[in-house]
Amino acid sequence: STIVDTTGEVPVILRPGGITREQLEKVLGRVELDPALAGAETLKPRAPGMKYRHYAPKAKMYVVEDKEALKLLPLLAKEAAKFTTAAVICGGAAAETMQRTQNLHILNWGSDTTELAVKLYRLLRRCDKLGVGIIFSEGVTEDGIGLAVMNRMRKAAGRQVLTAADIEALLKNSTQLKSFVLK
C-alpha cells in the first residue's frame, strides 16, 4: 500500500505501493519521494515496514539491476549452481532463454511489472520451498508500479545489489565465487 505524507507543501511518498507516483501527480500535482527510499542508512524511514529486511526469503538474495549486469546473470547463475541450489527470478524473455539445471531454478514472473507486483512474494516463498541457497532477481524500471516493486525487492534482498563489475569479478575467480555463494 502507498503511504503519502501530505502535511507539507509538497506531498511526499513515504512508501510506494499500488497507487503510483504518476497517478498521485495527476491528482495532487508535484509529488516527491522520501529520500529514505534510496536506502541511505543515515536517514530514518518515516513509514512502517521501511526499515528492516521485509518478507525476506530464507536464502541470500541479490537484485541485478543494470543492463550490463543482466547480460552476465545467466552465466553467474549457472556458475553459482555448481556450489548450491540457485534460483533466478526474471521476466518472460530472460526466463525463456536461461537454461535450467538440477541445481538452477528459473522462476518466470511473466511479461510485465504488474504481473511481478502480484507474484513477487509468491515467488520468494517458492524459493523457500525449493530450498535454494541463493536467489538472483532481475530488477525492473522504477516507473509506475515498478517503484513499489523495486522497493519491495530491494528490501527482501537486504538492499544487496550486484553490478556488472561485481559479477565480472566473481566470474574471474572461482574461489571468490564459491565463498560468495556459500557465505
Please provide the spans of the model-predicted regions.
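Active-site-adjacent structural elements in enzyme catalytic cores
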Residues: S1-K183
